Amino acid sequence: MEAIKVLKKKVPGFETSKLRNFSMTLGIRDSRKIVGKYNLTGDDVCKQGRFDDSVGVFPEFVDGYAILMLPTTGRYFQVPYGCLVPDVDNLLVAGRCVSGDVLSHAATRNMMCCTVTGQAAGVAAAISIKQGQTTQNVDIKRVQEELVRQGARI
């Protein structure tokens, strides 16, 4: 990387420096998140959290804040519907802004988990309309049945 070469050459004290880590340490990939009915935690991610309102599963994969856990163990956590539901009628959130703490965000901000939450939000929205319910009061069992029918693992 050119920046490292320049630092070594031009900045006193950097002559023998080495790059050990980068953006994942700084946390610059963090983003705004909602405050949902449930706030997913790092413990949920790392200790295989299970939820009655699960709308999908995701492998134990954390990439950020100087932590790297690759999905090679077969371990997974469930994504609860509550982390998609803010305190606003008929609004669902999917992707990197679901409700969660800093560590859980390092697991849920990637594209695979965005797909899981996006499918769940779409199914829940459609069912809430059919049932004449708000997304906050949708029949979660019906949502789960439809997700399974579509081939999702919950």
Where are these regions (language model features)?
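Flavin (FAD/FMN)-binding glycine-rich loop and adjacent Rossmann-like elements that form
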Residues: 1-154
